Amino acid sequence: MGRLHSHRHGKSHSIRPSSPKAPSWIQGPGEVEDLIVKYAKEGLAPSQIGSKLRDQHAIPLTRPITGKSVTQIMEEHGATPELPEDLNNIVQKAVGLQRHLRANKGDRRNVRSLELIEAKVHRLDVYYKRIGRIPKDWKYKSVVAQLE
């Protein structure tokens, strides 16, 4: 699958564990769910929780053990963030680029980058409103028009 705003194909990806079975050293799904809820209450994003489970607790995948994804477990325990992780990451990237452009007025190339980032924000905005993940009245305010 190609990238959204480039001509590249996107070959990079992580290698999934070879065995879809649950590891033998895990006592049960309750232990994994407790860890996920604990890390979610500490403010970690779902991808950070997955990395922490993989690196520190030797749990490669949560779905074979619990039958649910990390975000589903977070939703069950009421520990989901107000914005989905991918939308939040793109909004944070746009905010950082806006801060950069305020300090560097002559950087015209990154004005275009900000336009592309904000296009991704609006695309995700429509999707998450349609599935009901964010409120219908949520609005991202564009800054590109003010910079030109």
Curated annotation (Swiss-Prot):
Biased composition (Basic residues): 1-14
Superkingdom in the source lineage: Archaea
Region of interest (Disordered), residue spans: 1-27
Oligomeric and partner information: Part of the 30S ribosomal subunit.
PANTHER family, alphabetized: RIBOSOMAL PROTEIN S15P/S13E (PTHR11885), SMALL RIBOSOMAL SUBUNIT PROTEIN US15 (PTHR11885:SF6)
Entry similarity comment: Belongs to the universal ribosomal protein uS15 family.
Protein name per UniProt: Small ribosomal subunit protein uS15
Organism listed in the record: Cenarchaeum symbiosum (strain A)
Upper lineage: Archaea, Nitrososphaerota, Candidatus Cenarchaeales, Candidatus Cenarchaeaceae, Candidatus Cenarchaeum
Gene this protein is translated from: rps15
